[in-house]
Regions:
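Structural motif
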Residues: 40, 126-128, 154
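Acidic- and glycine-rich mobile interface elements
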Residues: 105-113, 130-133
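Serine-dependent protease modules
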Residues: 1-96, 102-105, 113-114, 121, ...
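Surface-exposed, short loops/turns at beta-strand junctions within beta-sandwich domains
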Residues: 150-152
Length: 176
C-alpha cells in the first residue's frame, strides 16, 4: 500500500496502492510479473526509485486483470479514459499544505485534459466524483480498475459533488 509521485508533462501525478518490492526493476524488465515464491503472479513491475538501489514498485494484479483478460480474449487492449487528473484521500497528504480539501470519499478533479471525454461535459475542476455507474469511488485505483473494463466510446454515468450540489453526468469514454 505505497504511494509514489510521478512527474509527467510538467504535472505531478501519483500512483497509489502499489506493492513495494526489492526485485530489481530496469527499463528492460518493467512490465514483467512480480511472482510470489509459490508461483502466483501478484503484480506487474512498474517503476523503481532511481535514487535508491533495490526498491521497486508493482501494480497489484487485481488492477490489471481486465487488461490481461482483454489481451487473452481479443489480442489487444484499447485503454479508455475520462481525461482527468484527480487526487484521492490517499494522495492528498503528499501534496503541499496549500491544497486545502477534506476528502472523505470520492476523487477530487484537479484538471480536465483539453479535448478529452470530460472536456465538453458539465464536469469541472474542483468537482468530487463519488461514483461511476453506481460503483462507489474512494481511490483512483477504484476508478482505474473500473475504466479498464470499458472500451473507448462506452458511456458511463458519474455521480459528482460540487459544493453542496450533487449531480449525475453522462459521458462517452475517450481513447488514451
Amino acid at each position: 500500500n505505497r504511494t509514489i509521485k510521478i512527474e509527467e508533462e510538467e504535472k505531478s501525478s501519483y500512483m497509489t496502492n502499489l506493492i513495494q518490492t526489492d526485485a530489481t526493476i530496469n527499463p528492460g524488465n518493467s512490465g514483467g510479473p512480480l511472482i510470489y515464491p509459490n508461483g502466483d503472479i501478484i503484480g506487474i513491475n512498474t517503476v523503481k526509485i532511481s535514487t535508491a538501489e533495490g526498491i521497486g514498485f508493482a501494480i497489484p494484479i487485481n488492477i490489471v486483470k481486465p487488461i490481461i483478460d482483454s489481451l487473452k480474449n481479443n489480442g489487444n487492449f484499447e485503454e479508455a479514459t475520462i481525461g482527468i487528473y484527480a487526487y484521492d484521500k490517499e494522495v492528498i497528504p503528499y501534496i503541499n499544505s496549500s491544497f486545502n480539501i477534506n476528502l472523505e470519499k470520492g476523487i477530487y478533479v484537479v484538471q480536465i485534459t483539453k479535448n478529452s471525454a470530460a472536456y465538453n461535459t458539465e464536469l469541472k475542476e474542483g468537482d468530487i466524483i463519488t461514483s461511476i455507474d453506481s460503483i462507489e469511488l474512494n481511490t483512483m485505483n477504484d476508478l482505474r480498475q473500473y475504466i479498464y473494463t470499458k472500451k473507448p466510446g462506452d458511456e458511463v454515468k458519474l455521480q459528482i459533488k460540487r459544493g453542496k450540489i450533487s449531480k449525475e453526468i453522462t459521458l462517452s469514454l475517450g481513447k488514451k
